[in-house]
């Protein structure tokens, strides 16, 4: 096989060119919310990654409230003995509610192809319901994955329920073209090896720079839409490698329909990752991931925005006891740092969360510790403002006009240094 000599680009290589002149008077005129896709209507174009350190059954609605679409990861409800039925029973309310839930290929086949949950008195999947499922694999290039999805889609039609399927990950734009022709996929996750907790590229050399991948898939999608030979034109999800607000905006500017965020969300205060609180006079560890929310974490949550902004507690419980309030203030003064543990789902730790008795595979993930700087609300508010600002510079009032319809500049190495301060 020949060496491909065409240069490929990552987010770091690009910046967005402003319009020559903008008719927008204020960035408040710009609307960064999704309105075209019924599955994501009125949300920001953002998913949480299906990682055990981000969303769980305890904080699920916090993400929703802040217009970020949460994904319930594969460890939630996982049975120590590997029982698929017990796991599905635990998360059934999320599935019935139409929430996004991550399943393994085996779980997906068990429920939506073999219909093994349709026991007497328990009709599941249910008639006229909509199920939103992410078949969560590392390797989205396997033909058997798409054969299974096609079977499940046909069975769903024959049984009068709707099945919305996300899968991936892929790292070749020609794979996207193949999926358009051969598979009924609704959403596809792009990128292998670009996530900060992923070491696949480092250890296997499988990698495709994500900015070029998004751009190439976008052009294929545009050419395939409406063609008779096409089975689907999946929404493009840029998954991995997002270091901050600018990378989210670049991904959408390149043509991604959505961005999926992992470790960046792990570092937010309410994420499912355990807290490590360092104080000047003491040291605390709190397992928020297990739903243990005790005084220490409540202290931080209630006073996160500072003592002068104590009314900003809409997602939290207020305690009126004056003595306890004083304790909280003292705790905040004593607090030095908050750290969250972030690890990829292919780490041995994450594998054990999904199935404690299974033999661990060679890890293609790593563990990092992230300093907490923001709440989910603070991050979301900032993202909205930065989105609106970028849209106003490029003279785009609506996200669908901004997506894939602005010009990007390839920068020199010295220009990149000037941007990445």
What does each model-found stretch correspond to?
Residues 1-235, 263-268:
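Active-site entrance/lid segments in N-terminal catalytic domains of soluble metabolic enzymes
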Residues 1-22, 205-238, 243-421:
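Alpha/beta catalytic cores of nucleotide-metabolism and tRNA/nucleoside-modifying enzymes
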């Amino acid at each position: 096989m020949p060496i491909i000599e065409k240069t490929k680009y990552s987010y770091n290589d690009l910046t967005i060119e402003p319009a020559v002149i903008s008719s927008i008077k204020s960035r408040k005129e710009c609307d960064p919310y999704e309105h075209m896709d019924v599955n994501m209507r009125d949300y920001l174009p953002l998913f949480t990654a299906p990682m055990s350190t981000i969303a769980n059954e305890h904080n699920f609605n916090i993400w929703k409230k802040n217009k970020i679409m949460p994904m319930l990861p594969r460890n939630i409800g996982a049975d120590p003995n590997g029982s698929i039925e017990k796991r599905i029973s635990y998360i059934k309310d999320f599935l019935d509610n139409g929430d996004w839930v991550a399943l393994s290929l085996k779980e997906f086949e068990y429920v939506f192809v073999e219909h093994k949950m349709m026991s007497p008195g328990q009709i599941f999947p249910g008639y006229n319901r909509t199920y939103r499922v992410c078949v969560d694999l590392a390797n989205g290039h396997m033909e058997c994955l798409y054969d299974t999805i096609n079977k499940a889609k046909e069975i769903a039609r024959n049984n009068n329920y709707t099945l919305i399927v996300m899968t991936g990950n892929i790292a070749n734009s020609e794979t996207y073209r193949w999926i358009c022709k051969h598979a009924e996929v609704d959403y596809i996750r792009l990128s292998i090896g670009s996530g900060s907790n992923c070491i696949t590229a480092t250890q296997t050399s499988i990698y495709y720079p994500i900015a070029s991948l998004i751009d190439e898939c976008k052009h294929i999608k545009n050419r395939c839409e409406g063609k008779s030979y096409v089975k689907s034109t999946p929404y493009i999800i840029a998954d991995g490698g997002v270091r901050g607000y600018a990378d989210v905006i670049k991904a959408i500017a390149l043509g991604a329909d959505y961005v999926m965020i992992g470790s960046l969300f792990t570092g937010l205060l309410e994420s499912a990752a355990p807290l490590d609180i360092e104080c000047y006079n003491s040291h605390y560890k709190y397992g928020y991931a297990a739903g243990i929310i005790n005084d220490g974490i409540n202290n931080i949550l209630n006073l996160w925005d500072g003592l002068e902004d104590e009314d900003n507690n809409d997602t939290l419980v207020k305690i009126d006891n004056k003595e306890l309030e004083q304790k909280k203030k003292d705790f905040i003064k004593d607090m030095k740092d908050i750290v969250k543990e972030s690890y990829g789902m292919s780490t041995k730790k994450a594998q054990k969360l999904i199935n404690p008795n299974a033999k661990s595979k060679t890890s293609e993930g790593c563990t990092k510790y992230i300093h907490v700087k923001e709440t989910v609300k603070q991050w979301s508010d900032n993202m909205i403002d930065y989105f609106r600002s970028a849209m106003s510079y490029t003279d785009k009032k609506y996200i669908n006009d901004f997506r894939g319809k602005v010009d990007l500049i390839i920068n020199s190495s010295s220009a990149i240094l000037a941007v990445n301060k």
